[in-house]
């Protein structure tokens, strides 16, 4: 949630900043509701002043032995008016809060202005795409030919946008997870966490998925009595890991906190009809190793650069060519104030595709979660950051395509061989 103070003054600058994100701020609504809030606030304070003045008068009358019945009756009436005004103010404030939850984060000053991914800015490239002397196959063809990637079985078990991995391909999938977690914990000092794959609505509200993006989530239903449950499958480990500090007051000496976790992720992929229907790129269920940092405002910019570098290091160790882009205002996620996407080279598509997204959310999520840091007598909102380190299925398909051989086999990257019993190829 953005700072509510920004919605109480001149809205022109805020409207212009949000417009770069494709969000139209309803200035008439916010000006009207703010005037209503001010009026109720003044009314409440005036009534409270009358009550306080009346209490003093009652004391003075009692001291002089005079009759207080009329004044007490008036004060009782005032107390009733105060309760009504306070109730109205609370109801109005709840309306304001619910409306504010729909507003995206404000872009950082150095985020390029743009409408779509076409306006993202390339920051750097690493590695040179391999030159093949045979016909390039896509990962779906490679996996199916090996008999280790089975979309038909997944469709029978569940439906479209699911997969079944078998044999050495399933082993490589597991090896990637172990390699990523070892890198983040041993090399970069993250605390590995095991978190629930089911969270409540407060957790999703804290990180920004609710209330605006409920259609992207899988919600659980109690079929015993057909009642809705306050439970959802996680769309990313960012949700449970970030919410570990929800409602907490942290000591500044504790920060930054660095968490990592491997989890499945579940997404409805609403709005993705017809896109990436073949293969592993866009699935309802996929695995990801996630990084989360909880930091001070002074630490967060530097930590975003570090986190992005940590995700890049995984690709470098796998010798997978990639590029890093800074997202423009119109392509950033709802909660982010600045984001880098890392895109890996896919030979079959002759292009780079997203494999990681690393974001600094500033105090946007912290304000929703009520998470603060204490520095002496002063407290302030923490900053939260998250990043994929990496999306496992997309890393697997990138390895399959970049390490494919003419005979249909896949060479296993050297860093993964210790996790695969020393094997050097998938046949």
Curated annotation (Swiss-Prot):
Keywords: Aminoacyl-tRNA synthetase, ATP-binding, Cytoplasm, Ligase, Nucleotide-binding, Protein biosynthesis. Gene3D superfamilies: Bira Bifunctional Protein, Domain 2, Serine-tRNA synthetase, tRNA binding domain. The keyword Cytoplasm applies. SUPFAM superfamilies: Class II aaRS and biotin synthetases, tRNA-binding arm. One of its GO terms (cellular component) is cytoplasm. It is an enzyme of class 6 (ligase). L-serine binds at residues 236-238, 290, 388. Pfam families: Seryl_tRNA_N, tRNA-synt_2b. InterPro entries: aa-tRNA-synt_IIb, aa-tRNA-synth_II, aa-tRNA-synth_II/BPL/LPL, Ser-tRNA-ligase_type_1, Ser-tRNA-synth_1_N, SerRS_1_N_sf, SerRS_core, tRNA-bd_arm. Consists of two distinct domains, a catalytic core and a N-terminal extension that is involved in tRNA binding. HAMAP family: Ser_tRNA_synth_type1. NCBIfam families: serS. This is Serine--tRNA ligase. It comes from Psychrobacter arcticus (strain DSM 17307 / VKM B-2377 / 273-4). The lineage of its organism: Bacteria, Pseudomonadati, Pseudomonadota, Gammaproteobacteria, Moraxellales.
């Amino acid at each position: 949630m953005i700072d509510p103070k920004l919605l109480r003054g001149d809205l022109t600058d805020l409207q212009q900043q949000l417009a770069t994100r494709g969000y139209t701020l309803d200035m008439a609504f916010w000006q009207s509701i703010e005037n209503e809030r001010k009026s109720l606030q003044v009314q409440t304070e005036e009534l409270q002043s009358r009550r306080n003045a009346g209490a003093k008068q009652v004391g003075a009358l009692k001291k002089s032995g005079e009759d207080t019945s009329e004044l007490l009756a008036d004060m009782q009436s005032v107390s009733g008016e105060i309760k009504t005004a306070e109730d109205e103010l609370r109801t109005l404030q709840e309306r304001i809060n619910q409306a504010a939850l729909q507003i995206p984060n404000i872009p950082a000053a150095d985020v390029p202005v743009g409408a779509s991914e076409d306006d993202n800015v390339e920051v750097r490239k690493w590695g040179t795409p391999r030159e093949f002397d045979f016909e390039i196959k896509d990962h779906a063809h490679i996996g199916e030919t090996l008999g280790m990637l089975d979309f038909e079985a997944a469709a029978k078990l569940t439906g479209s946008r699911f997969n079944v991995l078998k044999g050495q391909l399933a082993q490589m999938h597991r090896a990637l997870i172990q390699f990523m977690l070892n890198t983040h914990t041993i090399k970069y000092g993250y605390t590995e966490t095991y978190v629930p794959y089911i969270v409540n609505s407060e957790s999703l509200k804290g990180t920004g998925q609710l209330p605006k993006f409920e259609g992207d989530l899988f919600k659980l239903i109690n079929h015993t009595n057909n009642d809705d449950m306050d439970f959802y499958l996680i769309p990313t480990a960012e949700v449970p890991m970030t919410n570990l500090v929800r409602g907490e007051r942290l000591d500044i000496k504790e920060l930054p906190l660095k968490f990592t976790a491997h989890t499945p992720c579940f997404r409805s992929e609403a709005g993705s009809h017809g896109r990436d229907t073949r293969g592993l790129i866009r699935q309802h269920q996929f695995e990801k190793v996630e990084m989360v940092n909880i930091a001070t405002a002074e630490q967060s910019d530097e930590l975003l650069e570090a986190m992005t570098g940590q995700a890049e290091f995984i690709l470098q160790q796998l010798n997978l060519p990639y590029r890093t882009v800074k997202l423009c205002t119109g392509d950033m996620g709802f909660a982010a104030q600045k984001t880098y996407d890392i895109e890996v080279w896919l030979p079959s598509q002759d292009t780079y595709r997203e494999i990681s997204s690393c974001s600094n959310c500033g105090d946007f999520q912290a304000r929703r979660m009520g998470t603060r840091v204490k520095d002496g007598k002063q407290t302030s909102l923490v900053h939260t950051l998250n990043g994929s380190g990496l999306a496992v299925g997309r890393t697997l398909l990138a390895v399959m395509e970049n390490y494919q051989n003419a005979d249909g086999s896949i060479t296993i990257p050297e860093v993964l061989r210790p996790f695969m019993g020393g094997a050097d190829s998938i046949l």
